[in-house]
Amino acid sequence: ASPQQLQRINKLELVVETIPLTEVWLRGPKFVDQPDLADSAVSHRRYGDMGVHYAFGTDNKPYSPFATLWAAVARTERGTGTVLGPEQRLSRMDALRAFTMGGAYFCFEEDRRGSIEVGKLADMAVLSDDLLQMPEGYIPDLNSVLTLVGGEVTHQTTDF
């Protein structure tokens, strides 16, 4: 999106939902030789800098929120390993926020979910590794060993 489009999105108080894995990893080859186009493809850093609210989705194969999160952090094209629009890479915390608080805001439920606070639903996951400290290339291999929705266990691995 252009800066003018993002200004308009912000003025209209819209929320942008994107699937970084689709745009950067699956559709990445078309951006390899077009750095300007790569920079504008799901330019999350620019969204945040301009105050645009955004959230991540995962409705495409491979279905993995962690692969999607990795795509926003690494922005690596799958065939060549080229980093597409490196200045648009997100920190791990910003990418995590897009799934949690961004998703809640997208659904008009930011007062009920999206962060762990008193009075909110206890929706959370315990991950198989430390997202903030692990090597970047292993982020797609993360999985949930325990998931709670509304404070109730909905998933638990046998070894947790």
Question: What name fits each language-model region?
Answer:
Residues 7-14, 18-133, 137, 142, ...:
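His/Asp/Glu-enriched, well-ordered alpha-helical/loop segment
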Residues 1-2:
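Short acidic loop-to-helix transition motifs that present clustered carboxylates
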Residues 159-160:
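Residue-level structural signal for beta-strand termini and adjacent loop
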